[in-house]
C-alpha cells in the first residue's frame, strides 16, 4: 500500500466562532514548523483567525498542554514527531503520547487532532510534514479532523 492511500479530501469547514488550540513541539523543527503551518492554514481557511498556539520542547510534553487547552477550547491539535532510534524510548514516548491524547479527548469531550508523527525514519516524517515535496500534510489533516469533530459534537449537543 502506498503512503497516503485512502486519505479523504479535507472538506470546506466553517468553524468560525470555534476556539482552537494548537500544541506543537520544537524537536525536529523543520518538520514541526511545517506541520504547524498546515494546521494554521486549515484554521484560517475555516474562519479561525487566531488559534491559540503553544510550543513545547518534545512530544512527551504535548499531552499536559493539550489537556489545559482542552478545558477552554472547542478543539485542540497536537503536532510533533517521534523518529525511531535504537532504543525502546520510541515505543514508550509514542504509547504515552497517544494514550494521553486519547484520554484527554475522552475525559474532556474535546476533540484532539493527533498530528504527532511516529515514523521509522526522518524521510518518512518529511513525507508527511506538508512541505512542498511531501506526499501528505498531517498538520492540516489533524486540524481538519479536530474541527470537523468539534462541529459534529456541537450539532449532536444541540439536538440532545
Curated annotation (Swiss-Prot):
GO molecular function list = 6,7-dimethyl-8-ribityllumazine synthase activity
EC number of the protein: 2.5.1.78
Q: Does the keyword Transferase apply?
A: yes
Reaction catalysis annotation: (2S)-2-hydroxy-3-oxobutyl phosphate + 5-amino-6-(D-ribitylamino)uracil = 6,7-dimethyl-8-(1-D-ribityl)lumazine + phosphate + 2 H2O + H(+)
Annotated pathway: Cofactor biosynthesis; riboflavin biosynthesis; riboflavin from 2-hydroxy-3-oxobutyl phosphate and 5-amino-6-(D-ribitylamino)uracil: step 1/2
Xref: SUPFAM superfamilies: Lumazine synthase
Q: Name one Pfam family in it.
A: DMRL_synthase
Indicate which residues the UniProt annotation says bind 5-amino-6-(D-ribitylamino)uracil: 27, 59-61, 81-83, 114
Q: Which cysteines are joined by disulfide bonds?
A: none
- Catalytic machinery residues: 89 (proton donor)
Residues reported in the UniProt entry to bind (2S)-2-hydroxy-3-oxobutyl phosphate: 86-87, 128
Q: Does the keyword Transferase apply?
A: yes
UniProt xrefs under CDD domains: Lumazine_synthase-I
Gene Ontology biological process terms from the UniProt entry: riboflavin biosynthetic process
- PANTHER family per record: 6,7-DIMETHYL-8-RIBITYLLUMAZINE SYNTHASE (PTHR21058:SF0), 6,7-DIMETHYL-8-RIBITYLLUMAZINE SYNTHASE DMRL SYNTHASE LUMAZINE SYNTHASE (PTHR21058)
NCBIfam families named among the record's database cross-references: lumazine-synth (TIGR00114)
Similarity section: Belongs to the DMRL synthase family.
State the function annotated in the UniProt record. Catalyzes the formation of 6,7-dimethyl-8-ribityllumazine by condensation of 5-amino-6-(D-ribitylamino)uracil with 3,4-dihydroxy-2-butanone 4-phosphate. This is the penultimate step in the biosynthesis of riboflavin.
What is the official name of this protein in its record? 6,7-dimethyl-8-ribityllumazine synthase
Q: Which gene encodes it?
A: ribH
